[in-house]
Each structure stands twice: as C-alpha cells, then as structure tokens.
C-alpha cells in the first residue's frame, strides 16, 4: 500500500509542523531549521516543487505562496538561466492554434542528440490565438476574434481571466513587468502614434503618451523587455535618415512611469554596407543587437549596463556564406560557454561557438507540431519568445 500523501518524505522538518507531524521512528535524525529548509526549497526546479506540494499541508502552503514563487524564480534565474529557459512560439497560420516549447539546456549541452518540442493545442476552433510575449514564466495570450487577453503559466496550468481590449490590430507592441507597481502590462501602438497600455489584474486599458515623432520606422514590431529595468525597447530609425546612414536609436518605454525615452547605441565605425536593419534582442538580461556587413558578416553587440553607452561591447562575430535573403541574424540565447543560439536569415536555427566561429545545426524533433515545417529544416511562420519556468501566479 502506498504511504499517505502527507508522509511521502519522512524524517524531515515540515515547515510550520509540530513534533506529532514527524515520524517518531526517525526522531534521532537531525532536523533542519525552517529557514534553512526554505532556502533549500528555493533552489529547486519547478517540476520538483510541484511534486513536493504533496508532502504535507505546510509545504503546499509555502510553495503555493506568491512570494515564494517569485523568490524561487529570481534565485533560479540568477543561478543559471539556461536551466529554466525555453523558446515558446506560436505560428502565424492562425487556423492552427498551437503553442510550442523548445527546451534550451539539452540543445546547448547535446546538439547532436535530438531535442523534442512540446506543443499544446490551445483548443481555439474559431479565431486565432497568438502569443504577445513572455515574462517571469507567464505567457501573454491574445485571442484575436474576441479581442481578449489573458496570462497563462504553462508549468502550473493556471491562467488569469480573459479581459477585453478596445484595439485588436497593433503596429508595434511589447509585454513586460512593472516591478515598481507589481503589474504586468501589454503596451500597444495603433497606427503611427496612439499608445494603449493594457494592465493585467486591473484589467484596464488606458491611453498612454503619444508615440515619439522622431522615430518613423522600427526594426521589428515586438518590444524587448529587460528585466530589472522595467523597460520595453525597440530599434528605431530617425526621421530623415537614409538607409545607409545608420541613424538608429533604441526607443525605450518605462513601464512604471509610462514614458518614452532613448537608449544610445555604440559608436560604430564605417557604414554603407548594411543590407538589413539592425535586430534588437535580449541576452543574459542585457540588451543586444546584431548588425550586418554585406549580409555575410554579423556583429553581435551587448549592453552590459543598461543606458550606459560605454558598456556596449561586441561579444561575437558570425561569418556566413553568401545568400539571397535580406533578413537579419536573430540571437535567441547564449550559454554559459558563450555558445549562441541563432536564427539564420533563411529562418533555420543554428548554434554558433564564439571562440572558434563554427556553426552547428542541432537536431530538433517538432513532430508534435505536425502542421508545420520541421523546425530543424525551417522555422517559417513561427514567432519566438524566450520563456523561463516558474511558479508565478497570473494576476486575477
């Protein structure tokens, strides 16, 4: 007979428990103080913590608390973000409402072994469901036909209530966390200048500041969220600048103050040889961008200290063969050994070793997403975001 659910782990100190809750046969074993036990639990991965909720009522209460969930996420992320990182994607073939997850740790550690994609049928038979971003382990979902938003935690299965928004077609948008007010926000830009801020929990939509007029074009519609700064960021070309003049700035939006600003780019030498627009991304929670030279050499720059021009440094140079595509090189993640996961201009995923310059094509099994091209051959119609496992609860 299997043991009772509150006695799966015996001989341990249960947070908030009394002597009667512990096994008397194991009373001679050393007992950990509650604060040390909590510190140990904070270091555990999400899957283990979900299992440990069955140990006893006090553990379930602790692990289910919002503060523990956020503390666990921050501690695990700061220790090694690769352990909890995945790429989450949706496909732009709207009649296939599936969301897929590609784990990054096995991809970096064993590129010659097959890494499997886990995909979910989101059950939308009418209308399209798209992903608008991911932050703190929460995925922002947007149902286009009903004009509704919700936040979803794939690890726990919990989700917020749908709430309706007034605008459905975005020119630009970005999803992030306002750590000052403890709010998750989706910022959308309608047309050329109307900014709408959708706040989860309050389930409200408000008109924000006018979109800055100096920026007449953005490189990419999706704003990049930098955790800790509370900002969304877009690459923007200034008014009147020619395509070959490199007059680009990073346009930022402060989620707490709800104001626009600018972040300086590094001082780049040369010019006139760029085929595609710069591509803005976030690596190691730092702003990064790639810029090309004749579409065959791509430099990857990282801003170590947000907002400080002198902190920009080139972290990698990727050399490619000549090709017919005018798409940028897109970095998704970087391992502790400085291996970059990139999407090539032809939409294939590749691993790049910065020290040797070698490229490796990882083996990926995306058969669970059978409606699409296999990811290992081409990522067509897929929009990717970086996702981290967490126990964080969506606001209600």
Tell what function each PLM region has.
Residues 1-396:
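N-terminal entry/capping and adjacent linker segments that precede and initiate structured domains
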